[in-house]
Each structure stands twice: as C-alpha cells, then as structure tokens.
C-alpha cells in the first residue's frame, strides 16, 4: 500500500483528485470482509488521511455487516435494517478526521512520504508548504510494534495525538537532528493509530487544487488552497485572467479568451509573492469526440498513440500526444479523443516503447474534419 501511494504520486497528474474508498454499492461491504473493529478503524483512518478524495459509503460509520458477500446484500435500507448510533468509534473518527482535512491542507493537497512500512505497520507523512501531518498505523489487532527514530518534517517540539487517543494514539516528541528531525521511539499497540499535525499560517499564495483541470476560453475555474485572499492576480501561462471572487481558500476565475491553447501553468500573485504552478489544459475551442481506429502490429512493450496539428493531439510533439490507444481485439486499436469541433485535423499514429523511443507512421499525414 505504501509503494502504491508513492508510485501513484509520481504517475498520476492529479493524484489528490483521485476518489478513494473502502467499499461501495458494487462490491462486498468492508464490514463483511473485515470483522475486527480495530483493523476496520485503522483502515478508515488510512482512507481519511491518505492522498485522494475519500468516499464514505453509507453505513460504514455503523459497521454494517450484510448477510453475505454480494454487492446486492450490502445495499441495505438503513431505516429498517440498521440502527443509527452517533457514538460508534467509526462515526466519531470520520467526523474528527474530516475536521482535520478542513483544518490542515496537507491532507487534501499534500505530497506523501513513506517513513516506515512493513506488513502490519505503515507510517507516512503528508506535506503541503509548511503544513505537515504524520500518521502511524498498526493494522495488526493483536501485536505491538516499536519503531525507533522516525524521520519527520514536523518542527521540533511536543505533539498531541489529534484523535485524542480515540484509537489509542499517544503523544510524541520530535527532536532536532542533522538533516531532518526525528521522533523518539513510537510504540503502536494492536490496532493503534496516531495522527500528529502542524498547521502553519500561509505566508504566500498556495495553490492546492484546481477544478476542473481542462476547459476552453470563458469556462469558470475554481482554485483552492491558502493565502488566496486580498489583492491577487491570476495568470494562465502569461495571460492574465479575470477574477470573479476570492477568499483565503478559494478563487473563482475564468479561462482567458486569449489564453494559449494547450497546457498552461496557473499562478496566483499577491504583492511580490507568486504561488506554485498548477497545470491546466486550455482547449482550442468547442469540442466533439472522434474515435480513432488503426490496425497495427507491435512488439512487446510498445503502444500506439496519436499526435497531430492541434493542441489536443500534442501539436506534433510526441511527448504531448494522446494516451495509449486501447486494443481489446489486437491488432485493432482505438481511442475516443476530444478534439476541436468543425476543424480540419492532420495526424499520424506513432509507436512508443517502454523506453520512450518513438516510431512515426510513414507516408502523408492523415486528415479528417471533426
């Protein structure tokens, strides 16, 4: 799980926008497969503090256990099939960690660093600017672990478990050390979870997320983060955008009419301070869908892509081409692509191998009108 958090952080363009869940209406309820409440609570704490947007399936807070493992059995009618108790640990845990998500931007927007991992224990850290959260989880309900000298970006000092011992977490001490601070030994009893946090005031505009990440001129865009209040300006690349409204945590703006089509870095400027960059894909106009098809032989590790003369196809740059085509009936490949409507489009199919080596389709450019 720790490895997955790390590689998706590198592989996903917008990893903090991924919706995460323990269960849903299409799968077996988590309470059916995991009967230990200690492990159940540890999983819930992980869901609510790891990267992504957590999706809580109704009844999770009540430890619902259906009659069998089918997805249908899990779709209970709460009013008749379950009592509703606001004193369950799961209910209180969801509320407490949702509060932390609102309070500390490291959960919603932060990067992830794995500080310790074995088959039962995972310690990870989330960081966004100077906001830091350290989470230690023991999923094994009947075995304790002691981890010495855990590295952390938490400043030196004493830290209280944010959950107040709800999952038996204890307070920790962080000591200054050469290179990076470390904690004293952390002992985790069976099923124990500890959450420690440092919430810093924003000194510059900080972009945490943008919704959506793609649009055409005139589309409304929401920028989320911290330090976004006051007299600010927003740019898409080098083009300034109109700001409709702004607060400390949200800006409402629009894609500028003269923004350059393709990938633009959004920035927020406040006085002399400029925010971090956030990539936004400016479309070249109204869109429609074209499904591209090709019959092509490939070697192991090769995939087929499309590159063409419009920004949506990379403007002839193979590094900005489409995603790989699909091939459920190899050697037939296809891919639905959003392209500018009513436009003559020139394109080619290309092959890329695992090393990124590109082989261009021979012959004249293919031409369609969308």
Q: What is the predicted function of each stretch?
A:
Residues 115-153, 256:
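Carbohydrate-binding surface patches
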Residues 142, 152-157, 225-232, 297-302, ...:
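Short proline/glycine-enriched turn/loop motifs at strand-loop junctions of beta-rich domains
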């Amino acid at each position: 799980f720790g490895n997955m958090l790390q590689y998706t952080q590198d592989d996903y363009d917008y990893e903090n926008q991924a919706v995460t869940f323990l269960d849903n209406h299409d799968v077996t309820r988590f309470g059916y497969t995991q009967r230990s409440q200690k492990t159940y609570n540890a999983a819930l704490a992980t869901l609510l503090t790891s990267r992504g947007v957590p999706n809580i399936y109704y009844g999770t807070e009540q430890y619902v256990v259906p009659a069998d493992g089918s997805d249908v059995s899990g779709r209970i009618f709460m009013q008749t099939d379950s009592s509703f108790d606001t004193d369950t640990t799961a209910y209180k845990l969801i509320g407490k960690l949702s509060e932390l998500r609102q309070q500390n931007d490291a959960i919603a927007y932060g990067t992830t660093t794995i500080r310790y991992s074995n088959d039962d224990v995972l310690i990870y850290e989330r960081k966004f600017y100077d906001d830091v959260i350290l989470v230690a989880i023991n999923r094994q309900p009947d075995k304790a672990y002691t981890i010495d000298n855990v590295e952390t970006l938490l400043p030196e000092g004493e830290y209280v478990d944010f959950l107040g011992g709800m999952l038996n977490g204890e307070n920790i001490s962080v000591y200054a050390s050469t290179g990076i601070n470390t904690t004293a030994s952390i002992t985790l009893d069976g099923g124990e979870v500890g959450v420690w946090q440092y919430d810093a005031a924003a000194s510059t505009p900080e972009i945490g997320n943008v919704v959506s990440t793609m649009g055409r001129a005139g589309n409304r865009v929401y920028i989320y983060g911290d330090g976004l209040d006051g007299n600010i300006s927003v740019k898409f690349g080098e083009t300034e955008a109109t700001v409709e409204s702004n607060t400390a945590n949200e800006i409402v703006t629009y894609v500028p009419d003269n923004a350059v089509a393709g990938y633009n870095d959004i920035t927020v400027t406040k006085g002399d301070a400029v925010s971090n960059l956030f990539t936004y894909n400016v479309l070249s106009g109204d869109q429609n869908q074209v499904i591209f098809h090709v019959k092509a032989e490939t070697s192991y590790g090769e995939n087929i892509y499309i590159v063409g003369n419009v920004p949506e196809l990379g403007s002839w740059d193979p590094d900005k081409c489409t995603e790989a085509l699909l091939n459920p009936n190899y050697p037939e490949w296809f891919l639905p692509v959003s392209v500018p409507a009513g436009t003559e489009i020139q394109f080619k199919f290309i092959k890329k191998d695992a090393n990124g080596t590109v082989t261009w389709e021979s012959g004249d450019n293919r031409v369609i009108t969308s």
